[in-house]
Amino acid sequence: MFGPYSGGGGVPLPQMDADTYVRTIAAMPPHPLAPPPDSPRTPHTYVGFLPVFGDLPPLTGAVLQEPVPVPPEQRADQPVAVATENSAPTRPQLCAPYDDEVEATLRAMETNPAERPSPYFLETTQGGRMSALVRASMIAFMGEFSRKNKLADGTLQRAAYFLDRYLSVTPESDDALQLRLVGATAVFLAAKYEDQYTLRKIDASMVAARCGYTSETRHKMVSIMETEMLAALGFNLGGPTAYTFVEHFTRYYGDGEEEKQLKEAAHRVADGTLLTYGFHRYLPSMVAASSIFLARLHELGHEPWSNDLAELTGYKAIDLMGCVCDIYSQIACPRFALLQGKNKRVCKSTSMQGMNMMA
């Protein structure tokens, strides 16, 4: 854990300590012994896309005999499912292998040291030349740049991921123009990764102009920085972010208004963590699960966690305590514009403070 962000304003909320946290998760109503048929682990959205083949009768010459209808409970060729009190919810057999492969791949990638930022890159690689507030101002600039150009969802999360990895291996100067170039290039690179049609919205020349470059060859500055960043990242761009895991954990959500609000709120919580130096030390899946926890607590007012969510995410409520408490400690800061609107992920106070330091 780490202390509250020191650069924000506002009156801090009381810390959510272990006792408060445990009381919160224990205040849930008891869970039923058997999961409902529309469990989050049941990929009902896949059913319409999977071919269903009935029992084909044998062919004798050119004669096709009609099968005799048999009640479902008397079908001898169907396995009998025996439900017990301890039965775990299961996915349809046709979907399970694919779903499990995706899960295993994401978990392996997020724990790969080669694709993770250094835990203390500001203190080590940057040698104290860059403060947590300057980094936060870079994220604020990147968020504004991403929103103004209406870049793909998930771009800011991936751009921040690229930035932290780049700063983990590349010492940077404190030149404001250079810092803007680094941040904007990270957004440009992330946007192209997330959406193949990004170049229809922005190009290298527009990116350079947004940073403050005015020469006719300004696009070359972005191209050079992009090459340097790709080399620093080892050309490994596909690591999962908290956005990836929020999408993964809510993949069975329907089109209901409540589910949409929960998903959007979880994304806003996860985006808010980008501004605070230190959250990169948590695994993206834990940040995503903690964001869903707080979004449910805010939207539903009760039952922030359940057995189905524990199975889906791989985290019990008690496992999330540290991350949830760290996020909760930031909510009082004005710069952590939590759950206040779809596009209000970065507050103006942090942006203005950071821009003054970068100017």
UniProtKB/Swiss-Prot annotation:
Q: Which UniProt keywords apply?
A: Cell cycle, Cell division, Cyclin
Share an example GO biological-process annotation for this protein. G1/S transition of mitotic cell cycle
Concerning SUPFAM superfamilies, the annotation shows: Cyclin-like (SSF47954)
Name the Pfam families on file. Cyclin_C (PF02984), Cyclin_N (PF00134)
**Nucleotide-binding among keywords:** no
Entry GO CC:
cyclin-dependent protein kinase holoenzyme complex; cytoplasm; nucleus
Q: Which domain of life is it from?
A: Eukaryota
One example GO MF annotation: cyclin-dependent protein serine/threonine kinase regulator activity
What InterPro entries does the database record attribute to this sequence? Cyclin, Cyclin-like_dom, Cyclin-like_sf, Cyclin_C-dom, Cyclin_N
PANTHER family named in the record: CYCLINS
Please report which protein family the annotation says this sequence is part of.
Belongs to the cyclin family. Cyclin F subfamily.
Give the protein's recorded name: Putative cyclin-F1-2
Q: Give the species.
A: Oryza sativa subsp. japonica
